[in-house]
Design a protein with these regions (language model features):
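Membrane-proximal, non-transmembrane interaction modules
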Residues: 8-115
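Membrane-cytosol interface motif
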Residues: 1-8
Length: 115
């Protein structure tokens, strides 16, 4: 999965450890939004967090807990990116995004027998 590889790259950059929370959460948000757009087929990178939140309410395959966690991460990213809220050390949200991606990605069913 491309998004998971991008999260690994972001982690290795160590932006949060270098004190660049703004850039870290900007990149994290972009990775997550691209994934959401690809997975649920809407232009998430171009939408506001509020628009994405409204869209989530109409997605039948997205569990409430995953929806709430996704919105929490997007809001936190917005606060750090735009309001310059300080990020807590050690709370990079990469693992939270990784878990959401892993729990919401489509699983392909492979048949062992030709039909």
């Amino acid at each position: 999965e491309k998004a998971l590889r991008e999260l690994d790259i972001l982690k290795r950059k160590g932006l949060l450890d270098q004190g660049d929370a703004h850039q870290h959460f900007f990149e994290l948000s972009e990775i997550f939004r691209r994934y959401l757009g690809w997975r649920y087929r809407f232009p998430a990178p171009d939408w506001t967090t509020e628009e994405i939140t409204v869209k989530f309410s109409s997605l039948p395959g997205l569990e409430t807990q995953a929806r709430e966690e996704a919105v929490r991460i997007l809001i936190k990213s917005d606060l750090i990116k735009f309001a310059r809220v300080e990020a807590a050390p050690g709370h990079d949200e990469i693992e939270s995004v990784r878990k959401l991606i892993e729990s919401t990605r489509e699983h392909k069913v492979i048949s062992l027998y030709a039909e």
